[in-house]
């Protein structure tokens, strides 16, 4: 391996350097403060667990994205987390009470492949999850908190897609397609490939059901599309219930956040195997994928012995920072301190570090390198006392 190869990082793997790392950390702290103000408790799941635990519920769709290692102590397979939701489900299942549980988390996850060419395989996943609450109130709270997260990062303009897996499930039950046809329809709808959807629909004998299937990729849009959907799907109570949920959530979110454009999408197939109700995703200009997404996944903790209603969202902290339009303030200048073991100098440095950055030179270190980082310096005055002076009066002979 050449020396240059030693410096290379794998594709999709990156490191954070100043000042980006400092700003991302500041954003992380502000997000935790936001979640705390909403009553969400922070949890820190482990980076790796036994594979079986990570593949529970939501995790099974993530198996191909998960790095696997062998535990040298037990010989069992372990996985490095690719998503934190299965871990949160395990944590919630260990709680004995039946009241609502609100969790938030921020931590690195690792994926074998990136969802897109420009996305990271090592995102810093940030999210909130609400357990134990049935109904639209939980959906509205989680979506509101997601939008507050994006607002804090100054991401705009925003538009949000709202979907409901109950619509597709109900139509699939009516159509009575074979397993192969169902899989083909799923893929065609996911890609919004209208000709392929029409071709599959043509095999359905019942005209009314055939028209419902054909309508799915043509119903993406605003309020007018919801009105059209109600006419097309009238008479199916499961679909009508799903449409009511979508409309109720959209109405409240639209009133709270009028600047966010809301669309209904009946072809949103993301997470179809584990989502059980409303699903949503937020988008912004310049990013070809959702900047934040989530949905309802009731009973996700059933395999842990305690299935409960669950709703949540997640976002990549690094994407939040990079897509945001925040104007970051320049850090305050540091104080340059000379090298030395003088007791009075050390006491002054300790006091100053309670509210300032103080950089003390090492033996033989040149002061000039740090001059651009500092706006003040510690020097001795004429009486021999250590004092702080503006760096405009910088004299390298005073700080050695």
From Swiss-Prot:
It holds the Pfam family tRNA-synt_His. Gene3D superfamilies: Bira Bifunctional Protein, Domain 2. Pathway: Amino-acid biosynthesis; L-histidine biosynthesis; L-histidine from 5-phospho-alpha-D-ribose 1-diphosphate: step 1/9. Its main location: cytoplasm. The keyword Lipid metabolism does not apply. Keywords: Amino-acid biosynthesis, Cytoplasm, Histidine biosynthesis. It comes from the Bacteria. One of its GO terms (biological process) is histidyl-tRNA aminoacylation. GO terms for molecular function: histidine-tRNA ligase activity. InterPro entries: aa-tRNA-synth_II/BPL/LPL (IPR045864), HisRS-like_core (IPR041715), HisRS/HisZ (IPR004516), HisZ (IPR004517). It is found in: Cytoplasm. One of its GO terms (cellular component) is cytoplasm. The keyword Transferase does not apply. Required for the first step of histidine biosynthesis. May allow the feedback regulation of ATP phosphoribosyltransferase activity by histidine. This function is generally fulfilled by the C-terminal part of HisG, which is missing in some bacteria such as this one. Heteromultimer composed of HisG and HisZ subunits. Belongs to the class-II aminoacyl-tRNA synthetase family. HisZ subfamily. This is ATP phosphoribosyltransferase regulatory subunit. It comes from Hahella chejuensis (strain KCTC 2396).
